[in-house]
């Protein structure tokens, strides 16, 4: 047994840790990265390019109800990605573009081997076989301006492709209680967003009529896993994490889950959101007016 310090004032001063009823999860995350970079510079433009390789070891140690288990020991995930960075700066323009890849460590809540019953109608539990995500990210930002007319444009673009995307397997039991467990998607997750704004564009020589416009949009494509048959709930009074994972997941590669043997099927969701607006401004010596219009469109496909 061990000892701990209570997080609250209690006259009874509980100081003995009950090993059987206590749970423990440790994520020993090790990432080794190697990069090969080259740089080119000419006047106001800088270009960096190359490639990177990552070796990621994600070892998870868990202990619950007196049973301990280690996953991922000695196993490495290899990630490869090109690298690109471009910047250009001048009196009229500033442009930056970047492409790189990176992995992300798992949070403890994703691998905890005990159910979270803080909400009795929505019960979640961790997955000790979960693997870290690896994302390839591209960003582009651009700003242009005209010092004579004061017209300008500002834009931004982001595209993200996530391998081993962490999503959730969801199901409801016969009493309407919802359960979910994090899993790695077999299909990559895609996200993109863009935005732009034009401003102070003169429509006549006197610059009394000025035009402006703005636009933005988002796109996402990902999957989740839903039950295809009625699945019984989890017996919380006699819960055993190892037995649960043998039914839900199968072997370390998740053979039962991904084959659909445990009752789950992949569902794909696409979401698109677009919005934009225009405005017209009149600026006279004694009178100023402004007219604007905006619209938004959302689309979801399952």
Predicted regions and their residues:
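Exposed, low-structure sequence patches enriched in small/polar residues
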Residues: 1-302
């Amino acid at each position: 047994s061990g000892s701990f310090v209570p997080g609250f004032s209690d006259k009874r001063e509980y100081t003995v840790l009950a090993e059987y009823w206590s749970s423990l999860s440790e994520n020993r995350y090790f990432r080794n990265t190697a990069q090969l970079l080259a740089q080119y510079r000419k006047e106001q433009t800088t270009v960096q390019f190359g490639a990177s390789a990552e070796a990621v070891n994600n070892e998870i140690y868990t202990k619950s109800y007196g049973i301990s288990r280690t996953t991922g020991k000695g196993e490495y995930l290899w990630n490869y990605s090109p690298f690109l960075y471009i910047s250009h700066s001048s009196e009229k323009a500033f442009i930056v573009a970047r492409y790189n890849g990176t992995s992300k460590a798992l949070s403890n809540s994703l691998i905890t081997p005990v159910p979270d019953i803080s909400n009795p109608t929505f019960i979640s539990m961790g997955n000790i076989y979960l693997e870290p995500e690896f994302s390839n990210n591209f960003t582009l930002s651009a700003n242009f301006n005209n010092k004579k007319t004061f017209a300008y444009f500002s834009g931004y673009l982001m595209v993200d492709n996530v391998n081993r995307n962490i999503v959730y397997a969801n199901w409801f039991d016969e009493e309407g209680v919802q359960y979910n467990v994090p899993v790695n998607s077999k299909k990559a997750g895609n996200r993109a967003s863009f935005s732009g704004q034009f401003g102070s564009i003169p429509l006549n020589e006197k610059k009394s009529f000025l035009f402006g416009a703005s636009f933005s949009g988002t796109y996402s494509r990902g999957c989740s896993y839903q039950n295809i048959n009625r699945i019984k709930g989890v017996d919380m009074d006699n819960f055993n994490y190892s037995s649960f994972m043998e039914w839900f997941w199968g072997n370390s590669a998740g053979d039962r889950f991904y084959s659909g043997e445990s009752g789950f099927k992949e569902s794909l969701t696409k979401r698109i959101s677009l919005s934009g607006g225009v405005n017209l401004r009149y600026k006279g010596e004694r009178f100023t007016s402004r007219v604007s219009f905006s619209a938004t469109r959302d689309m979801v496909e399952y």
